[in-house]
Swiss-Prot record:
UniProt: Cu cation 4 binding residues: H503
Disruption phenotype: Impairs autofusarin biosynthesis and leads to a yellow pigmentation via accumulation of the intermediate rubrofusarin.
PANTHER family: LACCASE-RELATED, MULTI-COPPER OXIDASE
The protein, known as: Multicopper oxidase GIP1
An example Gene Ontology CC term for this record: extracellular region
Known glycosylation sites: N76, N228, N283, N396, N478, N520
CDD domains: CuRO_1_Abr2_like, CuRO_2_Abr2_like, CuRO_3_Abr2_like
Residues reported in the UniProt entry to bind Cu cation 2: H82, H130
Protein family: Belongs to the multicopper oxidase family.
Length: 677
């Protein structure tokens, strides 16, 4: 038990360290619904401060982030911070109220409302943010996050080059990367896309364009060209059918299961699945200075359902970071990237100064489609041709087939950080379609409805009926090690499923094993004894997004330690699969549930009691009836005259005072408990 003087000294030390070690990064975002044409084809879309993709959050590790979101759209929204842990330094307590997941950590941000998200910039690396309300990622609410590491963080540059000049150049490049956000785009609004799936009963994977940093075009090559660029694997699977004029694949059993014969594809609107109309937009140009010697390109998988492969003409890529964490670098020519994933690559700037094409294509699983960007050497020849290693369909285009692709199964973290050798609990999840081709269950016990608990978030009542549903909710204890076994292809007659990109909110997990067939083990230890070649407990992948197999019945085993109590969504990151019910809730650390600050009470939205902005309703087609007031919160809880008058130091003290109050409340609670016992 701490004495009062000792407690005061610790609090003062904490205040001092917080002041000197981190900065406050404040963002004020207005989210609107307005016309845009990122691929040359106009439609209404989501913008943040009139930008698409949204503004980049650039900060240093452990900075305090505060993002005030004003919803001026005619529908609800939230913002999720993908890859961030929502960990706070206050009594090792997390910030689950800022996760941005309706039904879990907050209520939806309604039309005309504002919400303040506050969290630590942790962990370092490449991340992104996106909407988590319905399927509106399809409408454009997303943007990049980059968190610079501390200067003394171990780095793997010596594994790429032994030359000190190269190591120094890479050390400079990593703190000023070129962010490359890759997304897919369609002329149809998210609700129109989902309505097409529901009415047809089909799982649809067709897009109009792939965008690079929000730019691209709608290409319509001849069908013969599209057929020629279809992968051999897909040609075999499609025979005797073939791709259509959009490069989209016909519906088949591997993607529709037994519901192929009962679907109604004729109800799908023209231009969604077929009917290509070209539109010309612009392509992204990324300029690099050859005097820098090396450049870091940080790719972000913001696609909603596309499986991407990318390359840079005439340049090898050293993959050194995966989902924000360093790995033992791999030298490659191509990288396959799935929804939600991030890959940072180093490239040496030692080629002839000119333009080189960055090729971004569907890997061949859902569509024959491509996008292009330009890597431009400063002072070089513009508009010049370059030689690629993949074609329009994302397939190997070299004469000798000598293309090195990232080995996704072997991504040892750098430095090594192996998990515990044994877990305390195991949960087996049977993931499969649920009564239709486009609806899914992640648990095997039912769909997780996209609006489930939206106005009764589990954070505020972890013992509600929704929170106690054992078919859709996992409950864990703080500090315990948990194994999640994901089984696909377990239903009779449905051995094959489209790959699912599984993402657990708040932090990374280890993939310690994977194998083909049906999981029939009572424990992971039993499985390791039977199939030791399918497990790795020494250098397993450590990331926040994992991909299941497309090759038939298969399983993967994920292991993590519960260190951040709160309600977290675990779901497939294919946006249409999530909207179709592919999720579960994990209530981590149910035995030490977080104390919720007053400003994050059920209806406070980050504002102290008594300072909430007046609720105003949104209008239609990107307009609102009135402007929402922008309101900053002072330490006393009263409103300031104008948010622009709030200095960083004022807000820093605001944060510190809030933290001190929470520490004191916790200490007093501990004191009372110890005295009563």
């Amino acid at each position: 038990m701490l004495t009062s003087p000792r407690l005061i000294l610790l609090l003062l030390a904490w205040v001092f360290s917080a002041l000197v070690a981190s900065a406050l990064v404040k963002k004020d975002w207005t989210i609107t619904w307005e016309p845009g044409a990122p691929n040359g084809q106009e439609r209404n879309m989501i913008k943040i401060n009139n930008q698409f993709p949204g503004p980049t959050i650039l900060c240093d590790e452990d900075d305090d982030i505060e993002v005030t979101v004003h919803n001026k759209m005619p529908f609800n929204t939230t913002v999720h911070w993908h890859g961030l842990e929502r960990v706070n330094c206050v009594r090792m307590m997390g910030t689950p109220w800022s996760d941005g997941t309706p039904g879990m950590s907050q209520k939806p941000i309604e039309m005309g409302q504002s919400f303040i998200y506050r969290f630590k910039a942790s962990p370092a690396g490449t991340h992104w943010y996106h909407s988590h309300s319905r399927a509106t990622v399809l409408d454009g609410l997303y943007g990049p996050i980059f968190i610079r590491r501390k200067p003394d963080a171990p780095a793997p540059w010596h594994l790429i080059s032994k030359e000190q000049a190269d190591i120094d150049a890479m050390s400079r490049a990593v703190i000023d990367p070129k962010l490359v956000m890759v997304s897919d785009w369609t002329r149809f609004m998210s609700w129109e896309y989902m309505a097409a799936e529901e009415s047809s009963g089909m799982a649809i994977f067709c897009s109009d364009s792939i965008l690079v940093n929000g730019k691209g075009s709608l290409y319509c090559p001849d069908v013969d060209v599209l057929i020629n660029h279809t992968s051999t694997y897909m040609k075999y699977g499609l025979y005797p059918r073939q791709v259509n004029d959009k490069g989209c694949f016909p519906f088949m059993r591997s993607t529709q299961g037994p519901y192929l014969t009962t679907g109604k594809p004729e109800t799908i609107p023209l231009h969604l699945q077929h009917g290509c109309t070209p539109a010309e937009g612009t392509n992204e140009t990324i300029e690099v200075d050859p005097a820098d010697q090396w450049a870091s390109l940080n790719f972000i998988g913001g696609a909603t359902f596309k499986t991407i492969v990318f390359s840079v003409d005439e340049h090898d890529m050293w993959v050194y970071e995966v989902d924000g964490h360093y790995i033992v670098p791999q030298r490659v020519n191509t990288v396959h990237m799935y929804a939600g994933e991030r890959y940072a690559v180093m490239i040496k700037l030692d080629k002839t100064p000119k333009d080189y094409t960055i090729r971004v294509a569907d890997s061949g699983l859902t569509q024959v489609i491509s996008a292009f960007a330009t890597l431009r050497y400063k002072g070089g020849i513009q508009g010049s041709d370059s030689v690629g290693v993949i074609d329009y369909g994302g397939q190997n285009s070299t004469k000798d087939g000598s293309v090195i692709t990232l080995d996704r199964e072997h991504l040892p973290p750098y430095p090594p950080n192996p998990p515990a050798r044994k877990a305390d609990a195991m949960h087996v999840l049977s993931t499969h379609r649920w009564k239709s081709a486009w609806q899914y269950t992640m648990s095997g016990h039912g769909m997780y409805e996209e609006d489930r608990s939206a106005y009764g978030p589990l954070l505020y009542d972890p013992h509600s009926a929704d929170a106690m549903d054992e078919g859709l909710v996992i409950r864990t204890k703080n500090g315990s090690w948990v194994d999640l076994v994901l089984q696909v292809g377990s239903l009779p007659g449905q051995p094959q499923e489209f790959p699912h990109m599984m993402h657990k909110h708040t932090g990374k997990t280890w993939q310690i094993g994977s194998g083909m067939g049906i999981w029939n083990y009572s424990s992971v230890e039993e499985a390791i004894a039977a199939e030791p070649h399918n497990f790795d407990l020494d250098t397993p992948k450590w990331r926040d997004t994992f991909v299941t197999s497309f090759d038939g019945s298969a399983w993967i085993v994920l292991r993590y330690q519960v260190t951040n109590p709160g309600p977290w969504l675990f779901h497939c990151h294919i946006e249409t699969h999530l909207a179709g019910g592919m999720a579960i809730a994990i209530l981590d650390g149910i035995d030490v549930w977080p104390q919720i600050p007053a400003e994050y009470g059920p209806d406070q939205r980050g504002f102290m009691p008594g300072t909430l902005p007046e609720l105003e309703s949104g209008g239609k087609q990107g307009t609102v009836d009135k402007q929402c007031p922008l309101l900053a919160v002072s330490p006393s809880g009263g409103p300031k005259k104008d948010s622009g008058e709030t200095s960083a130091s004022d807000s820093r003290w605001e944060t510190l005072i809030r933290g001190l109050i929470q520490v004191l409340q916790g200490w007093l609670s501990d004191e009372a408990s110890s005295r009563s016992s």
